[in-house]
Amino acid sequence: MNSEEMNHVNPFEISDNNDVSIPSQRYPFANDPADSVFCADDFLQSYGEFNMDNFGESEPFIDASGAINAAIGVTGTVLGFLGVPFAGALTTFYQKLFGFLFPNNNTKQWEEFMKQVEALIDEKISDAVRNKAISELQGLVNNITLYTEALEEWLENKENPAVRDRVLQRWRILDGFFEQQMPSFAVKGFEVLLLVVYTQAANLHLLSLRDAYIYGAEWGLTPTNIDQNHTRLLRHSAEYTDHCVNWYNTGLKQLENSDAKSWFQYNRFRREMTLSVLDVIALFPAYDVKMYPIPTNFQLTREVYTDVIGKIGRNDSDHWYSANAPSFSNLESTLIRTPHVVDYIKKLKIFYATVDYYGIYGRSGKWVGHIITSATSANTTETRNYGTIVNHDSVELNFEGKNIYKTGSLPQGVPPYQIGYVTPIYFITRAVNFFTVSGSKTSVEKYYSKKDRYYSEGLPEEQGVFSTEQLPPNSIAEPEHIAYSHRLCHVTFISVSNGNKYSKDLPLFSWTHSSVDFDNYVYPTKITQLPATKGYNVSIVKEPGFIGGDIGKNNGQILGKYKVNVEDVSQKYRFRVRYATETEGELGIKIDGRTVNLYQYKKTKAPGDPLTYKAFDYLSFSTPVKFNNASSTIELFLQNKTSGTFYLAGIEIIPVKSNYEEELTLEEAKKAVSSLFTDARNALKIDVTDYQIDQAANLVECISGDLYAKEKIVLLRAVKFAKQLSQSQNLLSDPEFNNVNRENSWTASTSVAIIEGDPLYKGRAVQLSSARDENFPTYLYQKIDESTLKPYTRYQLRGFVEGSENLDVYLIRYGAAHVRMNVPYNLEIIDTSSPVNPCEEVDGLSHRSCNVFDRCKQSISVAPDANTGPDQIDGDPHAFSFHIDTGTVDSTENLGIWVAFKISELDGSAIFGNLELIEVGPLSGEALAQVQRKEEKWKQVLAKKRETTAQTVCSGEASQLTNSSQILKIRNYDLIQNFRIFSLRNTLSIKFKIYTITNYPYSRLNYDLFMELENRIQNASLYMTSNILQNGGFKSDVTSWETTANAEVQQIDGASVLVLSNWNASVAQSVNVQNDHGYVLRVTAKKEGIGNGYVTILDCANHIDTLTFSACRSDSDTSSNELTAYVTKTLEIFPDTEQIRIEIGETEGMFYVESVELIRMEN
């Protein structure tokens, strides 16, 4: 063929003639047929770029491989270490992380992050800003290196105080650095250019705050400081996230335009910033180890798109996005999928044609369209068509059960046949290799045209433009089929035809992260996260940028369903939902059609507000559930929902430990006790009531002493301290109704009963019956003395009423303030325990105090239609509150404050308790003026009455008073001498001698009994003298013991007995011991009423043992003759420290302790 003939060849002939036979070569460039036509120089002139490198290459003006490698490596490393790591894992984690961020302990990688964004948006960071950022980053490198070195040393040697102090010091320096220098990475005007630097620095800061929460207690941080650091972790997570999302959107918006080249840059920015910024911030919630204390299967379901498979040349005219390219909007709407559920490719059928240039010697295959079959996690399938799929040959690739972890593509710009004219006018995809893995087996599926002159057997596996150049693996230390970071999940396509000039057929590959699990496995040992896009029957909308994937939206009452595969059906789980909503309602969960959870949710944002980080919240379901089937369906639904949208980020399935209920009780108790105190922990919050403290104490007592002995002791001390604070501020005398109708207590009518053991009250409550008749009401009252009051001060009466009808409450000072309370008896006690009597047979006796409820297995249900009023606390109709104000305080007048309860009706009743009268604070403003007016009016009325009384006396109209002598009633008590043991021994010896003289010869029969008794007395004497506790028999009152209120020594039947009459009473003594000896703790005591009494012994190493006494318990370590008698219990201990502490307390009722002995064992 001569030159003239060649000039008549159609350079662009598209052929689908199956009869054309074209010889094939596997490696076309080894023996290019063009060389037989042209000399080398001619070939280079006409096909100047006809070599492997230029058939398809990366965009020449951006090289972000180093930055992307580091960003993907950071994300992959964090995903692998979520939860609370053990020491070795934490060291490995930081080593891997710093390998990506600080290779060679310098800032080179961070400079790459800056260059990456500069190239993406074609702007430059000023030298001043760059130099300052690099300087601060070098400081970060130095500080974080010192911290991690100290941390590693401490993890290996936690017992060394110097090492501990060093790591804490280094952490504080590093934390201060972050707090001070983070603004340097967000300089005004350069926020987008510094965005990747800011993101990675923020990530490190949050990781360091996570360390402080995990290890803070061991470093010596106070609980308050640990909580403050946790609060900062949450606050900075929101702050850093909102910053990153805001400036990501700003940078992306700046790249919007109308042409294809702008879209090319736009898509690259979106992809690379997703990898470097959005993926990182999506993991921030997982740093909260309160929420994620165990490994978590976190999934990034977002999709990223690699570059269009189109030729990129050396000149603008050689690029696919040059002349006759689709518009920006056309590319975006055609190539980028709308929000959808997660899917993966099952089959891909590619249709191809051939392009003839330079006759049959330049024939190439050309991808012109495809049919893609996708499957979802719900096993549903969908088929979509792209491009031209009729009248063309095709190749079908089956990817069932395979992950496509890499592609190698051959895009080509085909030039016309014309000497010296090398501008391509036809852009095609000539061949693609799909690299797959299934289990450990790898394979390569190939698309190619058998009619292709040079690639009739496909593209060699080592050639092409590889997807890993844009989506590198998580690590280079492992093979790509193991360490790959992304899977191919979809292929879109766009075609532009303009005759035979500048026509383009362009596929686009869509990828999801390798963390996505298509089978929805539910793991028994880690938290399973199911994003909203892993379900079906769910509406999917675009994510706000920080979730890690698109989110769900309710469709009416329907939120979606999830098909899951449960590894262990015997394991219990609980659910947690991350959501945002503008309304309130109930969220329910079904498993295989049965409702297992139904909880109320609260609104998280106002209508119209954007979906920010703080707009999302968690709804945690505490009730554990089981799956009945290995393959199950979870359904989420809404109930009682008003208008508004419910957004669903995802559902989390959390394995429940075998001791989950106990752990939940511990957390509830911690929360309840913490809520009682101000931030300083030394005072009660002003709105905390005595009833709330009692309920918190009930929660503490339900904590498992076997699992959480230390925590229980600490919380019990805290709640007792709260009770002491409550009692110290309570101006009422005898609020527990222990001494009604006695001095300094309440005065009550005979129809008032004191009740104990009511499930609603921890202490005693009072019951008022109806009036006997209209002249004899039921009443209860007391006066608070003037000496305890302050001038111009507001006081508040508070309490808890189980129910009342026609109950009048009076607060009296300047006249009577009267309120009638009618509170429904609508509190239902739900007992979840089996109704058994634990004392049906105890030594053949029964006891009414044993038939009691278990506070740890009860809940209180309140009717939802209960009316609330202005004098109720937090809208609870059963918690009441009334106030009264004082004016001037005059001890001579001694007005005081009278508190009275009265029922005058024949159909009245009331049960109430936890009464308290507390000081609220000084009066001011209108309240002050009002009490001054009231006091002045009262004084005028009083003066007038006194004047009238004086006139009456002077006129002789007053009745004569009869003075009768006062009769004093003196009770005589028989005083019984409390002999010591040696006195008892002497008395016994004398009596035995008299018995021997007077009863001989029968006395010999009792001699053995006498000797046995004498030996026992002698041994008891030895025990008494060897008791290392001071005043263990309470002969000297409570000397040597630390005591609180409601604990006193009484003389009962001639013995000194320690009596605890309230659950907050505490008696304790610390003693020195020898840690190379064993000791016997022996306690003689008895319990009356409900609840338990206990004697706890603990050492400085937090080893705790407890002897428990109950009115209905008979244990193996107990010696007793009858149920109500004193029992003696013993316990052997072997302390590890040189000091131990004995603590005596009770849960409720009365506890009597006759003696406490701690005796050292002899070898």
UniProtKB/Swiss-Prot annotation:
- Gene3D superfamilies registered for this protein in UniProt: Galactose-binding domain-like, Pesticidal crystal protein, central domain, Pesticidal crystal protein, N-terminal domain
What the entry lists under InterPro entries is as follows:
Cry1Ac-like_dom-VII, Cry_V, Galactose-bd-like_sf, Pest_crys, Pest_crys_dom-III, Pest_crys_dom_I, Pest_crys_N_sf, Pest_cryst_cen_dom_sf
Among CDD domains, the record links this protein to: delta_endotoxin_C
Entry keyword annotation includes Mitochondrion: no
This protein's superkingdom? Answer: Bacteria
| Protein's GO biological process | sporulation resulting in formation of a cellular spore; symbiont-mediated killing of host cell
Give GO terms: molecular function aspect only. Answer: signaling receptor binding; toxin activity
UniProt entry keywords in alphabetical sequence: Sporulation, Toxin, Virulence
Role noted for this protein: Promotes colloidosmotic lysis by binding to the midgut epithelial cells of insects.
- Share any extra remarks: Toxic segment of the protein is located in the N-terminus.
**Family assignment from sequence similarity:** Belongs to the delta endotoxin family.
> Sorted alphabetically, which PANTHER family does this protein's record hold?
ENDOTOXIN_N DOMAIN-CONTAINING PROTEIN-RELATED, PESTICIDAL CRYSTAL PROTEIN N-TERMINAL DOMAIN-CONTAINING PROTEIN
Stated name of the protein: Pesticidal crystal protein Cry26Aa
Q: Which organism is it from?
A: Bacillus thuringiensis subsp. finitimus
Identify the taxonomic lineage of the organism of origin: Bacteria, Bacillati, Bacillota, Bacilli, Bacillales
Gene name of the record: cry26Aa
